[in-house]
Amino acid sequence: MASKKLHGRDFYNKIGRPKRILAPMVDQSELPWRILARRSGADLCYSPMFHSRLFGESEDYRNKVFSTRTIPEERPLIIQFCGNDPEIMLKAAKIAAPYCDAVDVNLGCPQGIAKKGKYGSFLQENWNLIESIITKLHTELSIPVTAKIRIFPDPQKTLDYAKMILKAGASILAVHGRLREQKGHFTGIADWEQIQMLRKNLPSETVLFANGNILHAQDIDRCIKYTGVDGVLSAEGSLYNPRIFLPPSSPLMTLYPRIDDMCEEYLNIIREFKLESDYSSLSAIKGHLFKLMRPLLSIHTDIRSKLAQGCTPRDFETFPPVVAMLRKRLLECEEKGEINEDKDVKESVKDSMGYPVIPWWRVQPYIRPLEVPLVTKRKPVEVTADEGPVKKKVNASVA
């Protein structure tokens, strides 16, 4: 039995009452990206999702997916595991415990690999197993256990599910306001109504995080105001603009930095901590740069080709030349007048949702066409841009 440890709101208070949080992802919330997120305003970060069996059994796997470097600004940190065996998950969690503040159980992954491996959201029909996993970690780990879930179509079932997980011992419950079927082209709009319902019906001491519909920095505050949650996670939104965690009152040019500056800052973090040869830190570098550069790649296709064909994921030195090429190109565009103050982001120029119009040379959210899976059987809802879950004429979705 583990010694007495903080739980629930006491634990949340101890780690600084985080409100702006980098969500767990598959591969893409690795060490240098977490540092970038923290320097961009994130109060708490999750690790990528790790496979509990492989993490517990294979030192080679651990070295490939997780850096044990001691970096003060890396805390607080929650390490997330997927799996379906309480003993195996406990073994992995005990190995991770010295390097984090809590361990999270992934109950939300909707991907095919999770279905095949019987983990993530594909455990949500097996409440007894979930309860046994949470209870095992809660009673035998030296640090708290948390959980991240998706919602059910029936709000009452979502509430009962949340109560079961909390009763089993979860200190924090992160709720992605989408169904298991809402993924890929069918990501759709996250349901803030259900998250608000959980806040109203769970005990006040419950620490609740929300996930979904975070496109811009101001969406974090809107979500907290609308749902009443303690903190908000951003996954995909943070990949396209790490500054999403900054206070929304920050200058627009700070909230939406130039793409070349953002890419250079990311590469400099890898250099600063001498991670050029760290396998786990380089695994997602090409994907990160593609997302940061997305607004301009359809215009400057040679840069896209250079990044796609001229860069080797595990060879750090192949990436700086692409960023240098990008910087040179933007300087040339400035000289030609294609980039100038008149065309830049302004407080006075808003889109139909009330967000700033961002030019192609600045990082910005990815607007995905909205397709809702038939399984949801929901009617369209309308909400204004200053309250509620971003639904009015929204031709977009983002995690």
UniProtKB/Swiss-Prot annotation:
UniProt enzyme class: oxidoreductase
Protein family according to the UniProt entry: Belongs to the Dus family. Dus1 subfamily.
Annotated protein name in UniProt: tRNA-dihydrouridine(16/17) synthase [NAD(P)(+)]
A GO BP entry: mRNA processing
Source organism (scientific name): Schizosaccharomyces pombe (strain 972 / ATCC 24843)
GO molecular function: flavin adenine dinucleotide binding; mRNA dihydrouridine synthase activity; tRNA dihydrouridine synthase activity; tRNA-dihydrouridine16 synthase activity; tRNA-dihydrouridine17 synthase activity
Coiled-coil ranges (or none): none
Catalytic activities: 5,6-dihydrouridine(16) in tRNA + NADP(+) = uridine(16) in tRNA + NADPH + H(+); 5,6-dihydrouridine(16) in tRNA + NAD(+) = uridine(16) in tRNA + NADH + H(+); 5,6-dihydrouridine(17) in tRNA + NAD(+) = uridine(17) in tRNA + NADH + H(+); 5,6-dihydrouridine(17) in tRNA + NADP(+) = uridine(17) in tRNA + NADPH + H(+)
Top-level division of the source organism's lineage: Eukaryota
